[in-house]
Amino acid sequence: MRLRKYIAFAGMAVLMLCSCNEMENAPTNKFTDNSYWTSTTKAQYVLNMAYSQMYNAGRMWSDESLSDNAYDGRSVDDQRAIRKGMATPSLDIFKNEWKDLYGGIKTCHVFLEKVDLVPNMDASVKARMIAEIRYIRASLYFRLTNLYGAVPFFTEDITLEESRSVSRTDRETIISFIHQELEDIKDALPTRDQLPEEDKGKITKGAVCALQARVYLMDSDWNNVMLYCDNLMNKQGEYGTYALFPDYAGLFDEANEYNEEIIMDRSYVPNLITWGEMVDMIPLSRGGRAVNRVPQQSLVDTYLMLSGKTISEAGTDYNPAYPYDNRDPRLTATIIYDGYDWSGNVDDGSKDVVINIRPGSGTDAYDGGGNGTSTGYFTRKYYNPQASGDQNSGMNIITMRYADILLMYAEAVHETSGMTEAVWNKTIRPIRERAGFTADAALNFPAGKSKEEMRQIIRDERRVEMAMEGLRWYDIKRWKAGNEYLSGKVRGASFVDENKLDTRKFEEARDYLWAVPISEINLNPNLAPNNPGYGN
């Protein structure tokens, strides 16, 4: 595919542009030289470099590890400091995210400044490329505001001197800009149905609607969430045709990339531009290395029984002696547990392979130390049998999909007027049907629930459907539920020594935002004061 070819180039080119792409450093390589901009192809290279800077697998897994879904048990790094309530403005993770995001914005501004130099460029192609770069810039600013709140904001390239005097702009102004940008560019972009095969993976009008909905979701602007989700649910002739992919596990199979559920993803190129985080999440017997990032028990406990009951409610058929039997099939598609039928669930040509994790059970056994799992679980979702021996995978990372649209719509309806049977039947029910539920109690609208009970059902459905996809931490932040979900003891399977797991601490007045990096404040005192709780 043409996009993957350009991304392969971008993977090399980004090193040249971004190595000096911090906000305070102006790059001096050929991409900023007027002489570079001689063809549409060269402009496309820079555009696709911006695509590669917008999001990546590392960010997704890092975000997930900050939530209550995953636990990075071997780390002694910045993430652990954040999770334990010990973060300071000097953490490298704060500095590196800041640098990388402004590096992507720098690429966008270079493109916007230089693209008019390209001779004989088709006007419609240029308009579309400009719309794509503006979408990428909006996405980068959205992430910046989610992490840091008020940040430096500018819409054209700035000089070194300007970068060391610019002040922070309030989040509300930046969010308003994002919404207007997305509204302004949508008509310059094709729908999913209009994309030629070689352009699969590029930004579409549907992706604009999905990002609009997600930005409004962070602000609990429910009416606008419903508006933009409705565009994708009920106006598909205008915004593109989307549907749930029939097989939940198959969504995360390289063979099914760019299917009808995918609104936006981060494209990779097998054997060329890859990601390798899975090597530290899978069983040692299947190619794992030092298992760092593993699911938490609280996530496992959220999956329903096939009967539709939770594991703890009255009348449940949950059996603690066989805790994974008769559970929501998405559990098996997402998490590897003790007694996991590997050969039955992973198409890698193996025969009769079972993953045993209980102490003393073999290579993958929990031992409370070493390189094995710290919670008694491994990660299944996004495992790629076609990856290299060291788990370098060319599988795309999904950033937006249609199930998320249905879940956002369901949440927005409930928070405004209350969930109804009609809305349930076009949102939660089809998601559960696709997952493999057949029992009426699981599929039918649960009448008689209180507002809070229904809210929890919707939130739990979102958690299990989107688990290990990088969204949970942001959901907790927007719900202002940090103390509920991000404080207290990390739990593992029944055979795990929980004394060896962390106790998390969430400071309500501080931890919804990261600190502005102290290195940036040292360069530019106008960035002070820092966010609450981090000092000046």
Go through each PLM region and give its residues.
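Flexible, polar/acidic helix-loop-strand segments at domain edges
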Residues: E261, Y318-Y402
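TPR-repeat structural position
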Residues: A43, W222, M419-E421
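Polar, glycine-rich mid-to-C-terminal structural blocks
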Residues: L211-D221, M226-P320
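Hydrophobic, small-residue-rich alpha-helical packing segments that form membrane-like cores
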Residues: F153, D157-N256
